[in-house]
């Protein structure tokens, strides 16, 4: 079974509002099987029913990406922020139901990046352990709710320059196993794995059945095939892990402060990128097919 391949909505625009609905049809026209949409904020004014109608009509699947922050962090020292984090993750379940999505992925626990306005702060080992325990506690509360609704959260490790607690695949596995709910799995992103893992294929195989979402990104966050990633080995590892779920492309390329600031990305091109997207999609699909026929 071939994995569905999708594109993140930030490739086109952010925020994604009711004025952005034409990008759903564009994603399908480019050949993608699904779109990875940021969980809409109430102020975005997105009509969930209309999004669902268009996606169903186009045969376009939907995956959601959570947006945590300082005010909604289940790892926070502040009780109000922890409550905000739990409430937000519960809202993500509701949004997934309204939009017709099953997977909600992301770091989930909040407070990533100094670039997003968080002042640098040297966590001690004890503080990080406490934050990790709070993360497990918070996810243990919301993951069963997701499972009951037929949804699943994907906990994404981010590299050491962007967050704490979960930087590696092994750390994500540890949290997921500690929670022990079918409503929580692991989400992997090759951009971050390229910095943190000694072997990306080995990390994928170690994740195994815990893997619920996968992002195929180059080492420089550009289009697949323009960097150093060994897509054949990565696709083969996905097959060996028994992963048949969605594979999303996430090239952060927009000249937009709402994208650039949180990820410290300053070099966005100004040309039409549709052909690069098609080529990247074709490369990932070919790698998956090759892995299947040579397995």
UniProtKB/Swiss-Prot annotation:
Annotated keywords: Isomerase, Manganese, Metal-binding
Entry superkingdom: Bacteria
InterPro entries hit by this protein: IolE/XylAMocC-like, Xyl_isomerase-like_sf, Xyl_isomerase-like_TIM-brl
Record field: pH dependence: Optimum pH is 9. The enzyme is stable from 8 to 10.
Thermal profile of function: Optimum temperature is around 40 degrees Celsius. The enzyme is stable below 40 degrees Celsius, but decreases with increasing temperature.
EC number annotated for this UniProt entry: 5.1.3.31
Pfam families attached to this UniProt entry: AP_endonuc_2
Cofactor: Mn(2+)
GO molecular function: isomerase activity; metal ion binding
Reactions that this protein is recorded to catalyse: keto-D-tagatose = keto-D-sorbose; D-allulose = keto-D-fructose; D-ribulose = D-xylulose
Active site residues per record: 156 (proton donor/acceptor), 250 (proton donor/acceptor)
SUPFAM superfamilies, A to Z: Xylose isomerase-like
Positions of substrate binding: 162, 189-192, 221
Family membership noted in the UniProt record: Belongs to the hyi family.
Subunit field text: Homodimer.
Function (record text): Catalyzes the epimerization of various ketoses at the C(3) position. It is able to interconvert D-tagatose and D-fructose to D-sorbose and D-psicose, respectively. The enzyme is also able to accept other ketopentoses such as D-ribulose and D-xylulose with lower efficiency.
This protein's name: D-tagatose 3-epimerase
């Amino acid at each position: 079974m071939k994995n569905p391949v999708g594109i993140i909505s930030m490739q086109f625009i952010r925020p994604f509002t009711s004025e952005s609905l034409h990008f759903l049809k564009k994603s399908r026209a480019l050949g993608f099987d699904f779109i990875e949409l940021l969980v809409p904020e109430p102020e975005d004014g997105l009509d969930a029913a209309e999004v669902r109608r268009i996606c169903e009509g186009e045969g376009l699947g939907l995956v959601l990406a959570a947006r945590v922050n300082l005010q909604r962090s289940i790892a926070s020292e502040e009780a109000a922020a922890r409550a905000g984090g739990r409430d937000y993750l519960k809202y993500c379940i509701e949004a997934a139901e309204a939009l017709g999505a099953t997977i909600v992925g992301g770091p989930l626990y909040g407070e990533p990046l100094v670039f997003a306005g968080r002042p640098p702060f040297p966590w001690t080992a004890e503080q990080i352990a406490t934050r990790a325990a709070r993360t497990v506690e918070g996810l243990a509360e919301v993951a069963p709710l997701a499972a009951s609704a037929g949804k699943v959260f994907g906990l994404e490790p981010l590299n050491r320059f962007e967050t704490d607690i979960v930087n590696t695949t092994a750390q994500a596995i540890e949290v997921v196993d500690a929670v022990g709910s079918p409503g929580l799995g692991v989400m992997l992103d090759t951009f971050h794995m390229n910095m943190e893992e000694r072997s990306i294929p080995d990390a994928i195989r170690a994740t195994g059945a815990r893997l619920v979402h996968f992002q195929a990104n180059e080492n420089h966050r550009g289009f697949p095939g323009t960097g150093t990633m060994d897509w054949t080995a990565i696709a083969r590892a996905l097959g060996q892990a028994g992963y048949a779920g969605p594979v999303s492309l996430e090239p952060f390329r927009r000249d937009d402060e709402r994208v650039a600031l949180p990820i410290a990305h300053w070099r966005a091109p100004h040309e039409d990128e549709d052909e690069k997207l098609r080529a990247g999609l074709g490369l990932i699909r070919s790698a998956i097919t090759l892995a299947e026929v040579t397995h």
